[in-house]
């Protein structure tokens, strides 16, 4: 699993700025809502970070339990929560131990790929299966692996503005043999420079189908965009819907 210390107190403000820009938010809500209602439903948001997706789900009427291993991330979430119906829980989402079950489970912005080994991914999917209500669904928001594979072994960098006075440069290096992607985020202001990174191991759709079956789940839908476009060879997103077998 990705090291939660990556998102420590020194980097958390920068991480929150980047997450607010990159996380799908409204797009995630639109996609989930096209498969399951959210208003009045319970949602387990795994790997919630500083709460960007959790807040969007709550604003759609869901009661959200937001789980993350990074205490600084959850502290930031709690500062920004206001009156949204979001409960923050610190924990490793490979080992879920809630007494309750949920209508919806979400993992946004490649959180599923932060489980590094296949065994970790299967353990994570088993935890999801245990915590889904009958008729519930889990939603894995993933970049299509072809996007990573096109990079080869060469580093690629893209710079985005963060408001009026900061910018972030995202540098990614892909290891196609190991199915790994290293993303380095460099947030720059006039007098500040903050860096953090994420190490992810992607899985193909065929691998997700197999791991899901092992874990007691099945893939019941795959979309190519948050707007529900079909998943094709040209899709940049791989949005996977899972249900209990």
Curated annotation (Swiss-Prot):
Keyword Lipid metabolism in annotation: no
Keyword Methyltransferase: yes
An example Gene Ontology biological process: methylation
EC number, as in UniProt: 2.1.1.301
Catalytic activity reported: N-terminal L-alanyl-[cypemycin] + 2 S-adenosyl-L-methionine = N-terminal N,N-dimethyl-L-alanyl-[cypemycin] + 2 S-adenosyl-L-homocysteine + 3 H(+)
Top-rank EC class of the record's enzyme: transferase
Molecular function GO labels: N-methyltransferase activity
UniProt keywords, alphabetically: Methyltransferase, S-adenosyl-L-methionine, Transferase
Pfam families: Methyltransf_25 (PF13649)
CDD domains in UniProt: AdoMet_MTases (cd02440)
Similarity remark: Belongs to the methyltransferase superfamily.
Function (record text): Involved in the biosynthesis of the lanaridin cypemycin. The enzyme can methylate a variety of oligopeptides, cyclic peptides and the epsilon-amino group of lysine.
Identification of the protein by name: Cypemycin N-terminal methyltransferase
Source organism of the structure: Streptomyces sp
Gene from which this protein is expressed: cypM
